[in-house]
Amino acid sequence: LEFAKRKWSVAIAEINDERAKETAEMVKKEGGKAITIHCDVTKPEDLENVLKKVVKEWKGVDILINNAGVAAAGWFEKIPLEKWDWIISLNTKSIIHGCRTFIKYFKESNSGGYIVNVASNAGIASLPEMVSYNATKAATISISETLKIELAKINVGVSVVCPTFFKTNLMDQFTSPDQRQVDLANTFFGNAKTTSEKVACHTIRSIEKNRFYVITQKDGRNMWRMKRWSPELYFKVMSAFYKTGFYDKHLVKLLKVMNLIG
């Protein structure tokens, strides 16, 4: 919607046609143009179809935003292999399919462009009991870092967005073998003060400045700094918190404190 406020044309590629239609109507109300395209991001041919339809409709593409994804939790040894396949397909392979498709277009058109990959602070912080989600988001960050360098010579910018908890529909498909982990996730998202609109505004400002890491909240930035500056201390602190049961009792409070720092 932030793009719509700037009078951009927005293509909504979504597997849920009804949700795509609702989003398109909101885009139009904000002053932008919108089309909807049915898309399963796990299928490369669907991404090819999205590109063809957008180019046909608007004669080109300026920005690709890879925003599809799901969340999951679980102890490493208890996550079924099929759940690994599921989350990798949606969170990692979708990024690969989207980038492969649109990078080819950006190179052939020689028009420049921009790619925004939505990861998560989970890919940086590696909090416990979230290993499959952490791994896919770390992969998104690594892919983005590589593309930032590779695509510079063809004038294609890259940003990777790494929010912490914010108000989103991510819990709709959340999966875990343990109800306690589902309850914890609901608590974290339920206590989130940041809205999706704030994340979007922060992202657009970062695109305008060609900023690579888009860490949208203070708690995420503080965890990122701590891990970069003193990784051994970071893991000692996090391990101690986990051993003592701190996460279950006080993680929400910790995130609030970290939002006050920096």
Regions picked out by a protein language model, each given a short descriptive name:
Residues 153-220:
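SDR active-site lid
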Residues 77, 127-131:
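Active-site loop immediately N-terminal to the catalytic Tyr-X3-Lys motif
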Residues 99, 136:
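Active-site helix of classical SDR
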Residues 1-11:
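Canonical Rossmann dinucleotide-binding motif of NAD(H)/NADP(H)-dependent dehydrogenases/reductases
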